[in-house]
């Protein structure tokens, strides 16, 4: 049986700031050795050449090494999943998942947060966008579920991943070995990597059957309702963090999910918050005061609707040559979500093909039932 989990959100006040993590460790909220995973937003451009993710990784790993007993190699295995780009009001921050100190919480038959993590097999450049990547990710998700003590996929509410994308060096490497890659457009490869990973999650959880090569990044009817996939240049495997609920674990946190049907779907956000356990709010709740400080964080994926319209109204995000649609839709959804939560420190990430319905995306909420 896994141990009870602490989930805490801390601000990032500058690009190399890890003081929030250090303060929690110093305060005895959890030990450095018990940190399982970190999911956060960094303030870079969110693109291929966003190195703020690497800076945050170094800063957080340094704290874990300094304040814990794990070796550098062991700390390197802790998933640190950073999504770059804090467009609009989105505020840089980190959500930290850690085992609670022994004896702090008693076991309970009520569902409480449990976390498992895994690293996939190495993802080769030629795997990205193809069935091999789907299979490798699916296998990793199953390992993470087992480590979380989850046997029923219905108890999984959030799967956060970080996977490699393509850069010119890895494209050249594949071609030197006689292999081909899905795309030579490195920015597009971010979307492709995320999309393929999401299908691996969906396969592992039984949401879909194994897709064909032709369906990857094309058949938008295939998606996972709990996948949140990011990609970057800093790794060559899939980092996989599975968050769900389990009975008998204990603790004070619970996770739930829903979907946003489009970029303006506040009801989808409220549905996720209620699904996580805050079901005492009015059905027509439209104000953050009803949350009463019990929401730890929201995690969302978003995508510009490929039709170029939202609720029938035309927009030009996909035609804008000055500001990439990635940044525009992220800022839009970040504002919508902040209006619901009353807090701009939400995890909002873009490139959401196969993550929720086309033009929408998954919404995951983690709540503190004792706040």
UniProtKB/Swiss-Prot annotation:
Q: Where is this region: RU A?
A: 1-104
Query: Which residues hold substrate?
Result: 53, 83-84, 194, 230-231, 330, 349-350
This protein's pathway reads: Pyrimidine metabolism; uracil degradation via oxidative pathway; malonate and urea from uracil: step 2/3
Check the record and name the Pfam families matching this protein: Amido_AtzD_TrzD
Annotated region RU B: where? 112-247
- E.C. number, please? 3.5.2.1
Q: Which reaction does it catalyse?
A: barbiturate + H2O = 3-oxo-3-ureidopropanoate
What terms describe the molecular function in GO for this protein? barbiturase activity; metal ion binding
GO terms for biological process?
Answer: uracil catabolic process
- Family as reported in the entry's similarity comment: Belongs to the cyclic amide hydrolase (CyAH) family.
Q: What is known of its domains?
A: The monomer structure is formed from three repeating units (RUs) that share the same structure as one another. The monomer and the active site possess nearly threefold rotational symmetry, to the extent that the active site possesses three potential Ser-Lys catalytic dyads, but one of the 3 active site surfaces varies in composition suggesting it is involved in conferring substrate specificity.
Q: What does this protein do?
A: Responsible for the hydrolysis of barbituric acid (2,4,6-trihydroxy-1,3-pyrimidine), an intermediate in the oxidative catabolism of pyrimidines. Catalyzes the hydrolytic opening of the pyrimidine ring of barbituric acid to yield ureidomalonic acid. Can also use cyanuric acid as a substrate, albeit with lower efficiency.
Q: How does it assemble?
A: Homotetramer.
Q: What is this protein called?
A: Barbiturase 2
């Amino acid at each position: 049986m896994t141990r009870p989990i602490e989930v805490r959100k801390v601000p990032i006040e500058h690009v190399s700031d890890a003081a929030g993590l250090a303060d929690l460790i110093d305060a005895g909220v959890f030990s450095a050795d018990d940190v399982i995973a970190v999911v956060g937003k960094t303030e870079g451009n969110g693109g291929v050449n966003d190195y703020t993710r690497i800076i945050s990784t170094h800063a957080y790993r340094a704290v874990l090494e300094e304040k814990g007993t794990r070796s550098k190699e062991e700390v390197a295995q802790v998933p640190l999943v950073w999504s770059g780009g804090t467009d609009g009001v989105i505020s840089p921050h980190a959500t930290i998942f850690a085992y609670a100190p022994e004896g702090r919480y008693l076991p309970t038959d009520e569902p409480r947060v449990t976390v498992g993590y895994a690293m996939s097999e190495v993802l080769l450049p030629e795997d990205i966008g193809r069935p091999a990547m789907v299979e490798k990710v699916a296998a990793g998700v199953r390992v993470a579920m087992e480590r979380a003590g989850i046997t029923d996929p219905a108890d999984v509410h959030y799967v956060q991943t970080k996977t490699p994308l393509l850069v010119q060096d890895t494209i050249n490497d594949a071609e030197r070995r006689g292999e081909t890659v899905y795309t030579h457009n490195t920015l597009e490869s971010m979307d492709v990597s995320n999309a393929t990973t999401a299908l691996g999650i969906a396969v592992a959880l039984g949401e879909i059957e194994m897709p064909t090569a032709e369906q990857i990044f094309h058949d938008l009817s295939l998606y996972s309702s709990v996948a949140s996939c990011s990609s970057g240049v800093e790794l060559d495997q899939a980092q996989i963090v599975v968050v769900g609920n389990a009975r008998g674990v204990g603790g004070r946190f619970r996770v739930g999910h829903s979907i946003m049907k489009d970029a303006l779907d506040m009801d989808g956000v409220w549905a996720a918050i209620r699904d996580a356990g805050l079901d005492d709010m009015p059905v027509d709740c439209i104000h953050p005061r009803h949350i009463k400080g019990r929401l730890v964080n929201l995690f969302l994926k978003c995508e510009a609707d490929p039709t170029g319209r939202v609720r029938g109204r035309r927009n030009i995000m996909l035609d804008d040559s000055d500001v990439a649609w990635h940044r525009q839709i992220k800022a839009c959804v970040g504002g919508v979500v902040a209006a619901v939560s009353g807090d701009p420190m939400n995890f909002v990430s873009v490139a959401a093909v196969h993550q929720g319905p086309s033009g929408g995306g998954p919404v995951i909420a983690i709540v503190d039932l004792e706040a």
